[in-house]
Amino acid sequence: MDIKKFELDNLILWDSPGLGDGRDKDIQHSKGIISKLNELDENGKPLIDMVLVILDGSSRDLGTSYELINSVIIPNIGENPEKRILIAINQADVAMKGKYWNEKENKPEKELEDFLNEKVASVKRRINEATGLNIEPIYYSAGYKDKYDKQNPYNLSKLLYLIVKYTPVNKRLIYANHISSDEEIWKYSDEIKDYNREIKKSLFESVKEGISEGAEIGGEIGKLFGKTGETIGKIAGGVIGGIASGIKSLFSW
């Protein structure tokens, strides 16, 4: 499996396989990732702004993941790796084989929360011991939906908050076109921060940088998180904006 390119308007995502498919495949995958990380855009800047590594929270063996992070990504990502690498542990709900997940409140109970926090600490420690970097992983659950059942995501707002935060300020606003307006998706989190508020704050930083279509864009940002946000967004967009140039033409990803 090669690195695949996905385009959402001017947002470009590169999806790469991990390691663990055998020595020859691992060498091939590593070379592809290294090549992409070292690629520059037309302005001589790194093509890749940030790297998101998703780990399987239900797996006990993360050896190949550590090799990917410590030996492939970190040595080749360039400057400020701690601000450009995001590690997310998925399937938090089944990390202990489904035990201690409170389905009613859609969150981990204390036993599972302690287990997940220890896994976060372990991943952080292993990376630090190998590279000297302090990268703080997070855990989340993507949720699921089928014709019989549904489970909302958990900590997805935290993941999005960090993705937006790690994206250069002048490029953040492009996310506004692709964030779901379904409030249930963003409702459940560890509540360490008000992540929805922080996401809006980060997006408005882009508006303040001059990337704006005035009240219309401000309103679109606000709509992502409810009626109050929409009103505030329109006011902020109207005050800050007024530049009626298309957002798409302002990004070159």
Model-inferred region functions:
Residues K227, S252-W253:
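C-terminal or otherwise distal, non-catalytic regulatory regions appended to signaling enzyme catalytic cores
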Residues M1-I12, P17-S212, G238, G242, ...:
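Conserved GTPase G-domain substructure that encodes guanine base recognition and part of the catalytic core
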Residues G210, G214, G218-G237, G241, ...:
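Periodic glycine anchor positions in long extracellular repeat architectures
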